[in-house]
Regions:
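A glycine/serine/threonine-rich, flexible loop-to-helix segment
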Residues: 52-53, 184, 191-219, 259-276
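Canonical Rossmann dinucleotide-binding motif of NAD(H)/NADP(H)-dependent dehydrogenases/reductases
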Residues: 3-40
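Catalytic loop of short-chain dehydrogenase/reductase
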Residues: 15-25, 96-184, 193-199, 216, ...
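Hydrophobic structural elements of the Rossmann-like NAD(P)H-binding subdomain
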Residues: 13, 92, 146, 189-192, ...
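Conserved mid-core alpha-helix of short-chain dehydrogenase/reductase
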Residues: 72-75, 117-132, 228, 235, ...
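C-terminal helical subdomain
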Residues: 124, 191, 209-244, 249-253, ...
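Conserved mid-core segment of classical short-chain dehydrogenase/reductases
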Residues: 56-57, 63-74, 78-118, 135, ...
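Aromatic pocket-lining residues of Rossmann-like dinucleotide-binding sites
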Residues: 30, 181, 236
């Protein structure tokens, strides 16, 4: 993408961990589109990842912040507005985690302390972020806030575990807070329901590789990549989508509206023939 769709626009990008992450790809795409931004992640994530490389590549300041901590968020927003030279035009929330998934706990045997922690990081942090932005009047009119979701918020994907609940709440927060942000401040709030993507976080989901192949065979256009999601996010940040808000937008090659693909049927027929 070479169009300067975001020239003169300022923002914050949450969640860039490494080059495989969607937030990382989005930062690169926003930079290419002319936008300036602050990169942020939790201090522990900053130590684990390679975000300094991204900061140098995109000329973006890096400000550590725990997205579950309201004091951190307030300080982050204040510093971002100061360093970028004005109110914000876009924010990306690309944060999610489940200790239950990481530890292999089955959905029928969840650890509730872990559930609460994942809930706070993956979903409640989005409300805390928007509340801080709202109270500080930190967004310009016609600004755009985007969070990344997944179809498991609406359909059953057993191995996605309690992350499905987290994403469902995330989408609900986007609609509920998005109403007030739109009505009172003309700020857009949307979620993107992205194809399964082989990110560092996604690798923790059991059976992901098999599901990636299944989704690729099901989606008429194939799975959307992290880079393609980044381009889509740039479009949502741009002025071309000024009247798009409160939406959960499927960016999945058509997977979300296919019952079963002919490729899958043909594959099952072949297995039946082999078995007989």
């Amino acid at each position: 993408m070479t169009h300067q769709l975001l020239k003169g626009k300022r923002g914050i990008i949450f969640g860039a961990l490494d080059a495989a992450s969607i937030a990382w790809k989005t930062a690169e795409a926003v930079h290419e589109a002319g936008g300036t931004f602050v990169l942020t992640n939790a201090p522990v994530a900053l130590r684990m990842g390679t975000i300094n490389e991204l900061g140098e590549k995109t000329n973006a300041p890096i400000i550590p912040a725990d997205a579950t901590n309201t004091e951190d968020l307030n300080q982050l927003i204040e510093q971002a507005v100061e360093q970028l030279g004005g109110k914000l035009d876009f924010v990306l929330h690309s944060i999610g985690m489940s200790i239950n998934v990481r530890k292999g706990k089955h959905y029928t045997d969840l650890n509730y302390d872990w559930l609460t922690k994942g809930w706070d990081v993956s979903a409640v942090s989005f409300h805390k972020l928007m509340q801080a932005l709202y109270k500080k009047d930190a967004m310009n009119e016609w600004g755009s806030i985007v969070a990344l979701s997944y179809i498991a918020a609406q359909r059953t994907f057993p191995n996605y575990n309690d992350m499905a609940d987290n994403k469902a709440y995330l989408e609900s927060i986007a609609r509920s807070f998005g109403y007030f942000f739109g009505k009172e401040k003309k700020v857009r709030v949307n979620t993107i329901s992205q194809s399964p993507t082989l990110t560092t976080a996604g690798k923790g989901v059991k059976g992901l590789n098999g599901f990636l192949r299944y989704a690729e065979k099901t989606a008429p256009l194939g799975n959307a990549t992290a880079s393609e999601c980044a381009d889509y996010t740039v479009m949502l940040f741009s002025d071309y989508t000024r009247k798009v808000t409160l939406q959960n937008l499927f960016h999945d090659g058509g997977f979300s509206f296919v019952g079963v693909s002919q490729d899958i049927i043909d594959e099952l027929d072949e297995l039946d023939e082999t078995a007989s």
